[in-house]
Every structure is written in structure tokens, then in C-alpha cells.
From Swiss-Prot:
It is an enzyme of class 3 (hydrolase). ATP binds at residues 15-22, 102-109. Its EC number is 3.6.1.15. One of its GO terms (molecular function) is ATP hydrolysis activity. This is Nucleoside-triphosphatase THEP1.
Length: 175
């Protein structure tokens, strides 16, 4: 792979719940920060007394964190979670302002897709970013393909190999 191809890499990771997709995305973002500007968002689990009760959106650029979804009843739901549409404004702002060497999107999934204009903002951000690392829910692989994101399957067994491949494709050292 040439340096130009590496400089324009758009890589996705998918896999079953709990295999470490978000952990890998955070690890790559932290490694990349040593060499380049990184922007985007990570969807973090919120736990209380050891039980998952929701998700927050973490803005990589600012370090701010806002609620995305919580267990409960409401108008916009994904499974047992109610999506906080005010978080959609934050996600849109993050994507619309994306101007960095590596855009991290965690995730392209059901909660994010519930946000009005998410896919429009996502497409613009992906097309304008030289490097992209996206966590892609397995039900949204078609979206990743349409955006030119090459998706790798992550499992507990291949975690280290996928990590190395992601770093290589993004032009980062195998640290």
C-alpha cells in the first residue's frame, strides 16, 4: 500500500457485542493523537451497579460527554433504550465540524441512525476526511460500503491481527 493510499484509508470494524470494537477505536484514537489530529465521537456504555443503563456520546476533540440513550420509555427507542434527541445535535455538530487527520465514528448503528440528518452529516464528514475509523453495527454494513469504508470483522480470537491491520491501513505505527 502506498503512502497516498494509507493517507486516504477508510476502515471500519464490526463484530458481535462485547468483542472490543469501542475499546479498539479508543486505543487507535489515542495512538493516533501522538502523530496527527483526531476528531469524532465514541459511544460509551453507562453502567450503574454493574448493569448497562445507557450510552453517552464522547466528543474526542473536546472531551465532553452527553447522554445519548437511557433505559426507559419514550418516543424514540432502540430496544429498551430511549434516544435523547438533544445528543443528536451534538453528534451532528461533531460530524459537521470534522476537520482532522483521523475521523473516528463510534458507531454507525441504530441509535445514531435515529438522529435526524445523521447519515447526511456522516457522509459529508467521511468524504472530507483523509482517514476514517468507524465502528459499524453489523446491521449497517451497507451504509459503510456505500461510504467506501472497508469493514474488518473483529472477534476475541483475531483482535490483535485486526488491531495491527487497522493501524497499518491508517498509516500508524504498530505500537
Amino acid at each position: 500500500m502506498t503512502s497516498r493510499e494509507r493517507a486516504e484509508s477508510k476502515v471500519g470494524i464490526t463484530g458481535m457485542p462485547g468483542v472490543g470494537k469501542t475499546t479498539l477505536a479508543m486505543e487507535v484514537a489515542n495512538l493516533a493523537r501522538r502523530r496527527m489530529t483526531v476528531c469524532g465521537f465514541i459511544t460509551l456504555e453507562v453502567r450503574e451497579a454493574g448493569r448497562r443503563v445507557g450510552f453517552d456520546v464522547y466528543d474526542i476533540s473536546t472531551g465532553s460527554r452527553v447522554p445519548l440513550a437511557r433505559v426507559g420509555a419514550g418516543a424514540v427507542t432502540v430496544g429498551k433504550y430511549v434516544v435523547d434527541l438533544s445528543a443528536c445535535d451534538v453528534i451532528k455538530r461533531i460530524l459537521d465540524a470534522a476537520s482532522c487527520d483521523l475521523l473516528v465514528v463510534d458507531e454507525i448503528g441504530a441509535m445514531e441512525v435515529k438522529c435526524p440528518n445523521f447519515l447526511v452529516s456522516l457522509e459529508k464528514a467521511v468524504k472530507s476526511s483523509p482517514r476514517v475509523l468507524a465502528v459499524v453495527h453489523r446491521n449497517y454494513l451497507d451504509v459503510a460500503k456505500r461510504l467506501g469504508i472497508e469493514v474488518l470483522w473483529l472477534s476475541r480470537e483475531n483482535r490483535e491481527a485486526v488491531r495491527e491491520e487497522v493501524l497499518r491501513k491508517l498509516g500508524l505505527p504498530l505500537a
